[in-house]
């Protein structure tokens, strides 16, 4: 069975911490997979946040094992598609 921490939450909603890198990493370290909300902005780059882009991140973070990426805008989906390997 796979347990997925929604936005890093493992004990119910916590809007103060969800989608923050440290919170997500803590859930991963405890054995959970994590769904995260990903945005891309042409000026600000990659960001996490549910209702709006809040927390800047490096693209390499998105390559972390056991993350489920929820693209929150079309730019995020487009940018991710440029990094997808196809056969």
List PLM regions with ranges.
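Phosphate-group recognition and catalysis centered on beta-loop-alpha active-site segments
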Residues: 1-87
């Amino acid at each position: 069975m796979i347990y997925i921490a929604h936005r890093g939450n493992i004990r119910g909603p916590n809007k103060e911490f969800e989608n923050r890198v440290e919170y997500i990493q803590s859930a991963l370290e405890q054995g959970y997979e994590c769904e995260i909300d990903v945005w891309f902005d042409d000026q600000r780059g990659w960001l996490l946040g549910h209702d709006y882009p809040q927390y800047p991140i490096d693209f390499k973070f998105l390559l972390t094992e056991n993350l489920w990426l929820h693209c929150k805008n079309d730019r995020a989906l487009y940018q991710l598609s440029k990094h997808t390997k196809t056969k």
